[in-house]
Curated annotation (Swiss-Prot):
Fibronectin type-III domain segment(s): 328-439, 440-537
Signal peptide from the UniProt entry: 1-19
Location, primary (coarse class): membrane
Gene for this chain: Epha4
Protein name: Ephrin type-A receptor 4
Annotated organism of origin: Mus musculus (Mouse)
Amino acid sequence: MAGIFYFILFSFLFGICDAVTGSRVYPANEVTLLDSRSVQGELGWIASPLEGGWEEVSIMDEKNTPIRTYQVCNVMEASQNNWLRTDWITREGAQRVYIEIKFTLRDCNSLPGVMGTCKETFNLYYYESDNDKERFIRESQFGKIDTIAADESFTQVDIGDRIMKLNTEIRDVGPLSKKGFYLAFQDVGACIALVSVRVFYKKCPLTVRNLAQFPDTITGADTSSLVEVRGSCVNNSEEKDVPKMYCGADGEWLVPIGNCLCNAGHEEQNGECQACKIGYYKALSTDASCAKCPPHSYSVWEGATSCTCDRGFFRADNDAASMPCTRPPSAPLNLISNVNETSVNLEWSSPQNTGGRQDISYNVVCKKCGAGDPSKCRPCGSGVHYTPQQNGLKTTRVSITDLLAHTNYTFEIWAVNGVSKYNPSPDQSVSVTVTTNQAAPSSIALVQAKEVTRYSVALAWLEPDRPNGVILEYEVKYYEKDQNERSYRIVRTAARNTDIKGLNPLTSYVFHVRARTAAGYGDFSEPLEVTTNTVPSRIIGDGANSTVLLVSVSGSVVLVVILIAAFVISRRRSKYSKAKQEADEEKHLNQGVRTYVDPFTYEDPNQAVREFAKEIDASCIKIEKVIGVGEFGEVCSGRLKVPGKREICVAIKTLKAGYTDKQRRDFLSEASIMGQFDHPNIIHLEGVVTKCKPVMIITEYMENGSLDAFLRKNDGRFTVIQLVGMLRGIGSGMKYLSDMSYVHRDLAARNILVNSNLVCKVSDFGMSRVLEDDPEAAYTTRGGKIPIRWTAPEAIAYRKFTSASDVWSYGIVMWEVMSYGERPYWDMSNQDVIKAIEEGYRLPPPMDCPIALHQLMLDCWQKERSDRPKFGQIVNMLDKLIRNPNSLKRTGSESSRPNTALLDPSSPEFSAVVSVGDWLQAIKMDRYKDNFTAAGYTTLEAVVHMSQDDLARIGITAITHQNKILSSVQAMRTQMQQMHGRMVPV
């Protein structure tokens, strides 16, 4: 009987040879240790028992290549224990290996008379060993890996039809520690053929990321372990940040950190740093590509870090390598001189050729030349003055003064730029020679009062620095200071001193002196102010009486000064004491009150980060896996271990590579905001990493993620008390923010995070950045994006965000929580939502929502923001509801979720209308009166049972009209239920 089964099984194997002899190409991250299909000749595995158990069979494929298989089919005999052991397999450093088994198995039901002995499974075992010395199978040494069952088994019919039913199973085992291992297959009574056995391990293959090469890395021992690998920069590159990656258990590289940059003279191409081509260059180690040599420059070798300037062209010291080479300018044009006595005005035009630069300036060279030989010139010296300046002129004119009269001067105007010093040439200048005229003397530099009496002042002065000829006389002008030159006197003298007499005692006078030559008067000197005495100077200090008088007067003056000073000090002390008291009182009143500080008000945004966020060493952080992608980069989970503290789970936001300064500032601004908050219902900031890359924000880890997704996942699983508890936590956090004068602007269930204890915490403080990437945002008429469905009408219309607008958003969050994460306003468009709110519509109560909670929602949705409750009042209301669970009884409607009709607070009271016509007129829908009458809806009792399909059936197809009518219908239904006592009033 067994021989027949072998024959059948052997015949069936010919039908599957095509499936197992295809090209054996395995993934790059799998390293094969054993492949039975690749063995040339017999496998020679050890079987126990040697006879009657496993049997090696060779079959030929269509290319006449033998395939070695093992089969066994002892299904007629009970208590089978047939073992087959492989040769010793070296593990090559792998800690976890994988076994891929391809096999066929006979369906026991297709074999007659074997129901008690036939099995459809076999067992897989392994045994570790440091050497290949085991010649026999010792069953006790082997550890079981798994029991292998077939997904598909074949029958006699399949054999006849040559239908292939090949099973493939993969198992893994680890961690392994010895040099090698054996595999064993135990048959317990199945009809089975091992078509192929492949043993392999996984590795993260050699790869290049961010110009860093990461070697082949064998995966870790656990199926969830990550192996940190440091990369090495490719040739011709250097580290910018330490390149690291994590090798995952599946053989895939994860979370690249850091990067390398191509050296100067090299650029990245296909993951390599290749030398710049001839004619190209790269000056620095950056991620930029090689650039073509700028104009008037060249490179003659590969890998150039700069380009050489053409002959006659230069590059200034502060010129970047990317700037063109330039040359000095040509000479200025059209030099014109204008001589005025001993001053000269020069004007000229810009050079015809600027040399390719914009930093042109002009220098003036002055030379004084002899009359007999103009070629013998010498510098003018420091006595000559230039307006506005002599060198570095940005204008094309200069005024030169304080020259000597009747003297020959040569003036050179040089045009210079940033490269003139490399090639000074006379071609850059233009000159002119002039002769000064006869000139008046210069002003007198120093005038002194030698003696002052009651009625006179004795003056003396120096000769002008440049007399420009023979001084004929000096003129002294003086006047009383109070007259301010309205009435003055003139005294002339040939000497350089004079006595001015006939003055008034104790009077201030102002004196001016000027010189005159044959060319005329020079300028007056600077004013000299002198005050005449009250008594003759000889009286003061002569005799005892004068001494007593002087002491008495001096003492009186001192006494008056002391009294005045004492009074002033007393007043100041009084004011200071009062001001100090007020300041102390103000400080006392403000003690303990914290106010939110906007980080964008800091001139240096980094200062806000340093002030409000704690810097964490990157070595304290271990990234475990990526859990999402945010606006600025990846969001990961990981662990934080600060020295002296226990290790905690954290969430890690990373800033993606290639960020701009603005993106970095916006990214860290959220940390500057979070760092100011300390409340159990506000997400807690652990710290930031800014001193290395990637830049990271570290916060506490919230296991259950965002509130909206969490509620949808757990629809209907919580009690009303639990839901109200969540709302209470959110309200408490918002009260804290409101007390700190912080306006959130984007309060929604998606921005509330939930931890493992169902504690809800407010997060996402990035609304100060416009919500460009928020899928719920929509353009408003004033530009920018805001989440329409959660935003108060005044914030939509006027962008007026306050704590009251946050209260409106909180009402929407209440509705989201009680509806288990439904989308507010369902599938209505944003424009329809805005229009409906403007018309007074509000969201209906979710299914099973207590009346008290929906009423609180309606309070939050008051049109006038001053009518909305404060967050403190909201928290108090929720506390009362939690303490009084009877107030949270269900509403009358529990059959289904409400339809898409919105509630209209302006709907008429049911008691105020008596007919369908009155009702339609009250809600301004009387145009449909005939539709209702024709369809038989003639009483209000019939109307309250209508649905949206009923309205469409009677010809009301406009969605907005359907919503308005259904809103009023629902309001009437609620009023009827209240009148019949089916709802508990709060």
